[in-house]
Swiss-Prot record:
GO terms for cellular component: cytoplasm. GO terms for molecular function: GTP binding; GTP cyclohydrolase I activity; zinc ion binding. Residues 1-21 are annotated as: Disordered. This is GTP cyclohydrolase 1. It catalyses: GTP + H2O = 7,8-dihydroneopterin 3'-triphosphate + formate + H(+). Belongs to the GTP cyclohydrolase I family. InterPro entries: GTP-CH-I_C/QueF, GTP-CH-I_N, GTP_CycHdrlase_I, GTP_CycHdrlase_I_CS, GTP_CycHdrlase_I_dom. Its EC number is 3.5.4.16. The lineage of its organism: Bacteria, Pseudomonadati, Pseudomonadota, Alphaproteobacteria, Hyphomicrobiales.
């Protein structure tokens, strides 16, 4: 059975705080592209040279046939894996639809698969994100929530930060009655290095508005995630 690591919830013990409020994120951190077009960056040649240096550091012969094109390939892979730095999360959520026909419950999109990289070891972590929000008059296209996850995932992250950024972006742009985000993921920095424990899953969650204030809504959100019937 997979190990499950879950955050402590307020109210789980007599000593748990019930007045805790999560720290606010700076909107400039999650609403705009992280890299601006005029921002100074190393050249591609410098990036490839850095890869070559790392290969030499581990003891490889960078002139052997199998590694001649590796620096170029690694830089090209980084361009793809970290393209989220050049994309704007707010733009993804900008287009909304007003035809809700009086719908007043939350919208849930679950099992959004993603792969990201931890900022500590630059190693992959991967899993699924589950997102719910309760709209006020307008809704966003469902694919946009998956796209939002993809943008933030394609940056160096911690799972906690990724969870908070997704919730904060939806909260800031859509102004819903509440947002709930849960992420479950496996971290290769834990499974293939260090302690080497494969199959361990990490769970993180973030609630705002009605979800934060109403434990019954949190429970319903969790139930709908787990109910596969």
């Amino acid at each position: 059975m997979d190990a499950k690591i879950k955050p402590l919830r307020a109210g789980k013990s007599a000593d748990a705080r019930t007045d805790f409020q999560p720290a606010e994120l700076d909107p400039s951190e999650f609403l705009a592209a992280a890299v601006q077009p005029d921002q100074p960056r190393p050249s591609r040649a410098e990036a490839e040279a850095a890869v070559k240096t790392l290969l030499s550091y581990i003891g490889e012969n960078t002139e052997r046939e199998g590694l001649l094109d590796t620096p170029r390939r690694v830089v090209e892979a980084y361009d793809e894996l970290f393209q989220g730095y050049h994309q704007c999360p707010a733009e993804v959520l900008d287009r909304t639809f007003g035809e809700t026909a009086g719908y007043d419950d939350f919208v849930l999109v679950r099992d959004i698969s993603f792969t990201s990289h931890c900022e500590h070891h630059v190693m992959p972590f991967y899993g699924k994100a589950h997102i719910a929000y309760t709209p006020v008059e307008r809704v966003v296209g469902l694919s946009k929530l998956a796209r939002l996850v993809e943008i933030f995932a394609r940056r160096l992250q911690t799972q906690e930060h990724l969870t908070a950024q997704i919730a904060a972006a939806i909260d800031e742009v859509l102004k819903p009655r509440g947002v709930a985000v849960m992420i479950e993921a496996e971290h290769t920095c834990m499974s293939v290095r260090g302690i080497g424990k494969q199959g361990a899953s990490t769970f993180t969650s973030r609630y705002t508005g009605m979800f934060r204030d109403n434990p019954a809504e949190q429970a319903r959100f969790m139930s709908m995630i787990r109910n596969r019937g």
